[in-house]
């Protein structure tokens, strides 16, 4: 009973709180807080009251008034501090700011925000702040140090007050600006200021005396303090001349701790005479600045090693400082080791908890605080700003997880996870929203598309919280559908139909869904379509390289749906091109000129598009003869947790050619990744290979190809289990990093965004640095998202050189920095054009050009662009006046280049050339155009060559070459047998056919024999490239069944029948035509036999004007010439003679459009319209006048427009008559073509003609009237 009451209570409460449980009051959320600690020296200065040194934003949102509280080192900052101390302020948006700071103000700062009405609160992470400060020396008393010449001197910088971010120097007592010089013999410890001189010389004593002693000076934040002065007292003794290196006490201990992401300095000092050379090594390998975040500043003579950003994976190891000089003994240099232990401030191991978590009422959920840190962090959970100290029946704290059980509305709120160790703290904030929603189908239900004889799935997915506990399905008759008898109702409510039947399953379905808050029912219609089926799939093939394969795929689908096809090779979609084509009308995928890379598994996918999606697949294996079979049984030795594994395999058949090597390919789960070769195993007997430094944070699969002299095998099946790697730092910077100058004063820095598999971890972004070269400015740093590929440099200036650098960073750490790249910003294009362009040596495929170089004072000339275009000299008639869009271009670099040979031209072609100077701003003005005709050359192979193979004949047909390279003068064709495996070595004797021939029958061949067919075309330069093809003649047999004949009416009582032979049998010697009227009971009549060698068609006359049926029969000398066997008759073609009056006086029907009366009627109508139009034009314009000024303006505008059109569109001319008359024809001059060199006076005399009435009617007529030359010439075309 109490369970029912509880359910009723919850139901009532849920109704009051609205189905979505959208809160009326938004809880407070911090929206702006610093992501980085303020710990860099000089970032926060002490005692500076001019500016606000500490500014910590803590903006937050919420429905009610908010209250901000800040804590410093876990103690609340008293609000009175903001009232009485003018150097501390708490702004209305929660920002804390301060100035005039002291060293005591360093530490952690944390922001708390509270809703003043609901008392719900939230908080930020603890932000670490270091105050750059200088402590004064405790004593300023001078002091003296006694030392012998040749012995080392070590002097401590005297005690002083607390300091941070300071630098040390030893300066003159007379003037602080005069420093005691640092050298390879003199060092100052950067962390303590202690002075170390390897050995004292007379020069040192003299320097001390000149400076009147030296003082330890400490400085930071524009503050300086100096200690008392040090003077030297020299003790008499014998000077030590030479010594080998030995290490003094160091401020760095043998075991050092560092924090990931922060700076770490290691310092070593050695004494020797002469001064030693210091080298830093990591695990025995010498370190260099700029690699793996290592910097060895030259100012410290190699004593200081700085790691600018510590990485656990790179730097948790042993570093060695080695010292050596010419006194180093045979045992090697002196060494000092530093073992670096890297600790880590808390960070999210994968990602922080979501900012919003929706949990259906009465359901379970969880929040995970997945953190990585060293040492282990303390994890705490908070609700509405209050720590959850113990679990309840509804919310349980389980280490880094927070578990919600049987959730009620009371569990809604702000939940925060904090993870803290000695190095830092991170905080998450999640609003947990409890949903209570009765089932609703407002987002729709159906329609459903099912396919005959396939599995059908009908989803029932209402909006509901909790998920419905009850689902019921009903058919259109209202009968409930239960699991069984071909139905299954899955847990999520989906109705599964095992095998769809149209008669049973087309119609309406209803789904009923219920939870304890309510129920809902929806009705949808199911339509059943015929499923997609492949009726003829591709077959497995083994073919030779260089041949062609045809893969057929025919499918059927529902007639109301559109059927599509796509092809895949090894699961990658095939891109169609000139070599790989899908012949849609034939349902054939054809691949020409096969290469070994084309081997693979080809899959045809036939489908109907979404939402009515149905697909069918069929696959075939295509092996390229000679290449090995792929390896099998691929195995991985481990799951790749450390980014290393070993791949093993079983070698496949080599196909009679020894395997040379193996190619290992890799692919990840990311959508932008593809199969990529990552290893070349050169040992042909290998059966395993180690894979190291794999891509991080990825699920990887591998496959392998074996390679022999014929090429690579098909790829193996990929590894069955994924290789899942841990996260790592990026190992590269973005590819194609460069500068791209744009218009004047523009510069874009561009790169190729890194593919997801190259990230090595989540959260990738780029750091970009840039500055103007030789400006003295610091590098400007910007941050760019992983998907970005460019950055526009602000205020780039006119033709200024910039330098820039990029780095990829992810949540694990920083990748390597790119080298500095330099580029000039944008400039204007050159203003001059190349002059005196001349043509030099000409060959069939090249033209030499020369010109005078261009100078440009406001930037650079990077080179020249040569534009060229042409057309065959056979058809060339006109010259272009502007560069057409299809022109080719060649870039010639170098401003001083004045001669260049353009290659790759087509023979026997008229080319035009235009040259421009260019730079990053674009092209300069165009040069004058020059022309050249290339010489003839040998032609390419004939085109559209078809080879029809029979038993004793081969028929070859062709068309002229697509690359004639001149005037074709002849063809030749021939054939020759071959028995070896290399038919290219066979010499073919060919017979000339003459230039007009388009077919050649090769006779007297041997059945079932391999032949090489070869043919060539010729120009005056000789025979061109051969077309060669290997074929095998068929067995001796009668002709195959002919194709349907082509029949055309040639007269009112006759037709021409064209014979079309069939393939697969012997060649046709003779053929006859069988014909009859298409009347029931009519018998076929036969023509006499026609010699197929002499003619391929026949005229049949004396026919009636009725429909006839025609078919053909063929024969040859099989099995004997005396008793030949006829072929089967072809299929029937129906046709009739040409309509008209027959010669026997019978009238047949004539189409209306060919009737004489209809043609006469059209002519009469046209004449009437012409007379009417002439009358209208005459009456409108008679006696009209207009002003001379307007007429002249119109004429000038027309001339300008015409000139503009010529310049943009281009026009052609030659020495003959122009294709179109000029816009203002001269009445007293001969026609002439357009000429760009004409003088402006050439247009004089082309004005309007003088009429008999003594006035210039055209010139001064009605201003509405267009002059004759402005009329559209097409206006009368209809009546001509």
From Swiss-Prot:
Localization (cell): Membrane
Pfam annotation, one family: fn3
Keywords recorded for this protein, A-Z: Disulfide bond, Membrane, Repeat, Signal, Transmembrane, Transmembrane helix
Sequence segments annotated as region (Disordered): 1118-1144, 1206-1280
Cytoplasmic side of membrane: 1178-1280
Residues spanning the signal sequence: 1-19
Disulphide-bridged cysteine pairs: 58-111, 268-321, 369-417, 460-511, 553-604
Expression by tissue: Component of the acid-insoluble organic matrix of the aragonitic skeleton (at protein level).
Annotated Polar residues bias: 1118-1130
GO annotation, cellular component aspect: membrane
InterPro entries associated with the record: FN3_dom (IPR003961), FN3_sf (IPR036116), Ig-like_dom (IPR007110), Ig-like_dom_sf (IPR036179), Ig-like_fold (IPR013783), Ig_sub (IPR003599), Ig_sub2 (IPR003598), Immunoglobulin_dom (IPR013151)
Chief localisation class: membrane
Domain Fibronectin type-III residue range list: 628-722, 730-824, 830-933, 939-1033, 1039-1131
Comp. bias intervals (Basic and acidic residues): 1262-1273
Protein name as annotated: Fibronectin type III domain-containing protein
Biological source species: Acropora millepora (Staghorn coral)
């Amino acid at each position: 009973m109490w369970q029912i009451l509880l359910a009723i209570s919850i139901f009532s409460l849920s109704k009051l709180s609205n189905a979505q449980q959208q809160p009326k009051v938004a809880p407070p959320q911090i929206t702006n807080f610093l992501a980085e600690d303020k710990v860099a020296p000089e970032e926060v200065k002490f005692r500076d009251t001019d500016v606000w040194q500490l500014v910590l934003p803590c903006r937050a949102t919420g429905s009610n008034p908010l209250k901000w509280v800040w804590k410093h080192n876990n103690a609340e900052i008293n609000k009175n501090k903001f009232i009485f101390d003018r150097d501390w302020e708490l702004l209305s948006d929660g920002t804390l700011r301060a100035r005039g700071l002291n060293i005591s103000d360093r530490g952690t700062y944390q922001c708390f925000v509270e809703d003043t009405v609901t008392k719900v609160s939230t908080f930020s992470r603890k932000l670490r702040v270091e105050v750059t400060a200088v402590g004064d020396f405790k004593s300023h008393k001078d002091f003296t140090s006694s030392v012998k010449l040749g012995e080392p001197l070590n002097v401590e910088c005297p005690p002083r007050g607390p300091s941070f971010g300071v630098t040390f120097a030893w300066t003159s007592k007379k003037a602080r600006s005069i420093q005691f010089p640092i050298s390879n013999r003199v060092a100052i410890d950067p962390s303590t200021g202690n002075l170390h001189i390897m050995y004292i010389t007379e020069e040192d004593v003299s320097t001390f005396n000149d400076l009147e002693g030296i003082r330890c000076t400490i400085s930071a934040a524009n503050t300086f303090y100096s200690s008392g002065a040090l003077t030297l007292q020299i003790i008499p003794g014998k000077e030590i001349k030479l010594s080998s290196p030995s290490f003094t006490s160091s401020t760095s201990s043998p075991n050092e701790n560092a924090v990931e992401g922060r700076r770490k300095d290691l310092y070593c000092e050695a004494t020797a005479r002469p001064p030693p050379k210091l080298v830093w090594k990591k695990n025995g390998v010498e370190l260099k600045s700029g690699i793996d975040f290592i910097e060895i500043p030259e100012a410290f003579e190699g004593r200081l090693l700085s790691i600018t950003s510590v990485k656990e994976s790179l730097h948790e190891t042993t570093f060695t400082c080695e010292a050596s000089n010419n006194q180093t003994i045979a045992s090697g240099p002196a060494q000092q080791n530093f073992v670096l232990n890297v600790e880590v401030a808390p960070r999210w191991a994968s990602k922080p908890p979501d900012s919003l978590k929706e949990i259906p009422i009465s359901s379970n959920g969880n929040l995970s605080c997945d953190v990585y840190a060293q040492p282990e962090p303390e994890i705490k959970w908070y609700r509405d700003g209050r720590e959850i100290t113990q679990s309840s029946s509804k919310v349980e704290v389980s280490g880094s997880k927070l578990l919600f059980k049987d959730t009620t509305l009371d569990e809604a709120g702000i939940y925060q996870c904090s993870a803290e160790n000695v190095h830092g703290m991170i905080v998450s904030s999640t609003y947990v929203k409890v949903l209570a929603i009765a089932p609703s189908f407002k987002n729709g239900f159906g329609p459903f598309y099912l396919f005959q004889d396939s599995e059908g799935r009908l989803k029932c997915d209402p909006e509901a919280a909790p998920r419905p506990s009850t689902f019921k399905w009903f058919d259109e008759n209202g009968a409930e559908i239960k699991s069984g008898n071909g139905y299954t109702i899955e847990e999520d409510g989906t109705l599964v139909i095992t095998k769809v039947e149209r008669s049973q399953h087309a119609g309406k379905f209803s789904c009923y869904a219920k939870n304890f808050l309510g129920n809902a029912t929806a009705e949808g219609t199911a339509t059943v379509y015929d499923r997609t089926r492949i009726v003829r799939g591709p077959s497995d093939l083994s073919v030779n390289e260089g041949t062609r394969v045809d893969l057929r795929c025919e499918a059927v689908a529902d007639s109301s749906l559109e059927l599509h096809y796509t092809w895949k090779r090894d699961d990658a979609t095939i891109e169609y091109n000139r070599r790989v084509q899908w012949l849609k009308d034939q349902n054939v995928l054809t691949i020409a000129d096969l290469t070994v890379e084309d081997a693979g598994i080809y899959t045809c996918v036939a489908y109907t598009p979404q939402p009515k999606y149905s697909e069918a697949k069929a696959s075939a294996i295509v092996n390229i003869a000679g290449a090995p079979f792929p390896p099998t049984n691929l195995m991985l030795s481990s799951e790749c947790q450390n980014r290393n594994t070993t791949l093993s395999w079983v070698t496949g058949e080599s196909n009679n050619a020894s395997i040379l090597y193996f190619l290992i390919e890799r692919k990840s789960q990311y959508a932008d990744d593809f199969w990529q070769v990552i290893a070349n195993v050169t040992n042909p007997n290998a059966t395993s290979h180690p894979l190291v430094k794999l891509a991080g944070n990825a699920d990887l699969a591998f496959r392998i190809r074996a390679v022999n002299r014929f090429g690579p095998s098909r790829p193996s099946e990929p590894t069955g289990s994924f290789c899942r790697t841990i996260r790592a730092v990026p190992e590269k910077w973005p590819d194609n990093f460069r500068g791209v100058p744009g218009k004047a004063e523009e510069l874009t820095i561009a790169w190729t965004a890194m593919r997801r598999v190259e990230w090595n971890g989540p959260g990738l972004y780029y750091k970009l640095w840039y500055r103007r070269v030789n400006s003295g400015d610091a590098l400007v740093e910007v941050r760019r998202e992983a998907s970005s590929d460019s950055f526009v440099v602000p205020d780039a200036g006119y033709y200024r050189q910039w330098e820039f650098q990029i780095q990829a960073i992810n949540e694990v750490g920083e990748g390597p920095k790119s080298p500095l790249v330099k580029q000039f910003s944008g400039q204007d294009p050159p203003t001059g054009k190349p002059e005196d362009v001349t043509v030099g040596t000409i060959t069939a495929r090249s033209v030499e050009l020369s010109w005078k170089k261009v100078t440009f004072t406001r930037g650079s000339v990077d080179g020249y662009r040569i534009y060229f275009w042409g057309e065959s000299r056979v058809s060339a008639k006109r010259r272009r006046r502007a560069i057409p869009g299809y022109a080719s271009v060649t870039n010639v670099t170098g401003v001083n280049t004045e001669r260049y040979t353009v290659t790759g031209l087509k023979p026997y072609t008229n080319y035009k050339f235009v040259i421009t100077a260019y730079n990053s701003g674009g092209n300069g003005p165009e040069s004058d155009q020059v022309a050249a005709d290339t010489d003839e050359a040998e032609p390419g192979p004939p085109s559209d060559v078809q080879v029809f193979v029979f038993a004793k004949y081969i028929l070859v047909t062709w068309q002229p070459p697509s690359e004639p390279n001149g005037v074709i003068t002849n063809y030749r064709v021939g054939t020759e047998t071959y028995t070896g495996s290399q038919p290219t070595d066979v010499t073919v004797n060919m017979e000339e056919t003459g230039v007009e021939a388009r077919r050649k029958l090769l006779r007297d061949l041997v059945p079932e024999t391999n032949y090489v067919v070869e043919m060539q075309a010729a120009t005056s330069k000789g025979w061109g490239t051969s077309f060669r093809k290997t074929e095998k003649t068929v067995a001796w047999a009668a002709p195959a069944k002919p194709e349907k004949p082509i029949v055309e009416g040639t007269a009112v009582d006759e037709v021409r029948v064209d014979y079309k032979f069939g393939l697969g049998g012997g060649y046709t010697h003779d053929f006859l035509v069988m014909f009859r009227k298409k009347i029931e009971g009519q018998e076929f009549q036969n023509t006499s036999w026609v010699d197929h060698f002499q003619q391929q068609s026949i005229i049949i006359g004396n026919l009636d004007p009725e429909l006839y049926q025609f078919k053909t029969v063929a024969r040859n000398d099989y099995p004997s010439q005396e008793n030949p066997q006829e072929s089967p008759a072809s299929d029937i073609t129906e046709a009739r003679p040409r309509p008209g009056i027959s010669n026997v006086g019978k009238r047949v029907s004539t189409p209306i459009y060919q009737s004489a009366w209809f043609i006469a009627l059209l002519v009469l109508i046209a004449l009437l319209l012409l007379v009417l139009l002439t009358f209208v034009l005459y009456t409108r314009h008679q006696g009209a006048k207009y002003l001379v000024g307007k007429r002249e303006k119109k004429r000038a505008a027309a001339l300008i427009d015409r000139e503009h059109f010529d310049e943009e569109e281009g026009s052609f001319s030659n020495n003959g008559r122009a294709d179109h008359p000029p816009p203002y024809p001269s009445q007293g001059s001969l026609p002439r073509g357009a000429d760009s060199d004409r003088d402006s006076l050439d247009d004089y005399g082309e004005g309007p003609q003088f009429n008999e009435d003594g006035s210039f009617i055209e010139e001064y007529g009605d201003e509405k009237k267009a002059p004759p030359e402005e009329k559209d010439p097409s206006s009368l075309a209809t009546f001509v």
